[in-house]
Amino acid sequence: MLPLLRCVPRVLGSSVAGLRAAAPASPFRQLLQPAPRLCTRPFGLLSVRAGSERRPGLLRPRGPCACGCGCGSLHTDGDKAFVDFLSDEIKEERKIQKHKTLPKMSGGWELELNGTEAKLVRKVAGEKITVTFNINNSIPPTFDGEEEPSQGQKVEEQEPELTSTPNFVVEVIKNDDGKKALVLDCHYPEDEVGQEDEAESDIFSIREVSFQSTGESEWKDTNYTLNTDSLDWALYDHLMDFLADRGVDNTFADELVELSTALEHQEYITFLEDLKSFVKSQ
């Protein structure tokens, strides 16, 4: 039952979303910030454990703990139940973890990690191509039109696996002009992800294009930014071909989803372990 908790929309998702770490500050901060997405991992069953009809211990007076250990810290029956739940959840998440190590990207990309932010770097023919993405808020909601199970109701059918589809930024720098970078802000349209029947279709899209100075820590809003919503399709196709010639194509986008999903799952398990240690600590 426990692995399925990751596949049902969370009843208490809004509170857990606040626990997720904010993306580290970087020149890509604004472009990498995705639109708010509804949380998809359910901790809603957390308070509905077998045999419990209320949350004990929360109103007990602060002082020497009720268990009689004499530590003087606040740890309740609810905390113990929480730790037990997290232990079971961590165990089950490790069972369904597909990648014990992060998958490799083909095409000679080198991976650099900084918390939840990842960079893929590739040098080819006098150019440096950098792809940056952040796994925070990268899992889209999975709504199938069916009602959520009520408390105590078991989920019988296997739910779809969670997939991380982060926004990503492609930065191209030419060696003969290292002061200027062509920046393309890309994303995965939700209606295109997982559509295998249309082999010709692009599974990612370019949203914005701009030139930015490589020496600036923050990109300037005063630099002209081209929005592709009103762009001529011929120019847009050339931009997509420009990326494909540098290794950013559908194959790359598929592998990035696999890498991001593995990284997100890895960070999720680490978060559960940290949460367990925090609740358990005295």
From Swiss-Prot:
InterPro entries associated with the record: MAM33 (IPR003428), MAM33_sf (IPR036561)
Pfam hit, one: MAM33
GO process terms (BP): apoptotic process; complement activation, classical pathway; cytosolic ribosome assembly; DNA damage response; immune response; innate immune response; mitochondrial RNA catabolic process; mRNA processing
Positions of the UniProt region annotated as C1q binding: 76-93
Membrane topology designation: Peripheral membrane protein
Effect in UniProt of substituting residue 204 to L: In COXPD33; uncertain significance
Swiss-Prot/TrEMBL induction comment: Enhanced cell surface expression upon platelet and monocyte activation.
Residue numbers carrying Phosphoserine: 87, 201, 205
Tissues and organs where the protein is expressed, per its UniProt entry: Expressed on cell surface of peripheral blood cells (at protein level); Surface expression is reported for macrophages and monocyte-derived dendritic cells.
Region entry Disordered, spans: 138-164
Residue numbers carrying N6-acetyllysine: 91
Location relative to the cell: Mitochondrion matrix; Nucleus; Nucleus, Nucleolus; Cell membrane
Modified residues (Phosphotyrosine): 188
Protein family: Belongs to the MAM33 family.
Quaternary assembly: Homotrimer; three monomers form a donut-shaped structure with an unusually asymmetric charge distribution on the surface. Interacts with CDK13, HRK, VTN, NFYB, ADRA1B, FOXC1, DDX21, DDX50, NCL, SRSF1, SRSF9 and CDKN2A isoform smARF. Interacts with CD93; the association may represent a cell surface C1q receptor. Interacts with KRT1; the association represents a cell surface kininogen receptor. Interacts with CD209; the interaction is indicative for a C1q:C1QBP:CD209 signaling complex. Interacts with FBL and RRP1; the respective interactions with C1QBP are competitive. (Microbial infection) Interacts with Rubella virus capsid protein; the interaction occurs in mitochondria. Interacts with Rubella virus protease/methyltransferase p150.
Protein name as it appears in the record: Complement component 1 Q subcomponent-binding protein, mitochondrial
Source organism of this protein record: Homo sapiens (Human)
